[in-house]
């Protein structure tokens, strides 16, 4: 039997430039991706470069709390 918490957890990645540039009302919305991470290999917050359809470019998406 497995003890403790699950090793793999589901996380949400949110575009950091959309959150900061909320003044720009042309593209209303914040890009979010759902993925999984291994808690043992990456204990810190995850940041990945993903495509944001609201910014029309690749930006840094950071892990947020649920």
From Swiss-Prot:
What gene is this protein a product of?
rpl33
NCBIfam families on file: PRK00504.1, PRK00595.1, rpmG_bact
Q: Name one GO cellular component term.
A: chloroplast
GO terms of biological process kind: translation
Task: State the protein's name.
Answer: Large ribosomal subunit protein bL33c
What cystine linkages occur within this chain? none
- Where is it located? Plastid, Chloroplast
| The family this protein is said to belong to | Belongs to the bacterial ribosomal protein bL33 family.
Sorted alphabetically, which keywords does the UniProt record give?
Chloroplast, Plastid, Ribonucleoprotein, Ribosomal protein
Q: Which GO terms describe its molecular function?
A: structural constituent of ribosome
| Principal location class | plastid
The record ties this protein, via InterPro entries, to:
Ribosomal_bL33, Ribosomal_bL33_CS, Ribosomal_bL33_sf, Ribosomal_zn-bd
Organism in which the protein naturally occurs: Arabidopsis thaliana (Mouse-ear cress)
Which SUPFAM superfamilies does the entry link to? Zn-binding ribosomal proteins (SSF57829)
């Amino acid at each position: 039997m497995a003890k403790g918490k699950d090793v793999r957890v589901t996380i949400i990645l949110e575009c950091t430039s959309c959150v900061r540039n909320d003044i720009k009302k042309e593209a209303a919305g914040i890009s979010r991706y759902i993925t999984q991470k291994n808690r043992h290999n990456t204990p810190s917050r995850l940041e990945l470069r993903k495509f944001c359809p609201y910014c029309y470019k690749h930006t840094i998406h950071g892990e947020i709390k649920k």
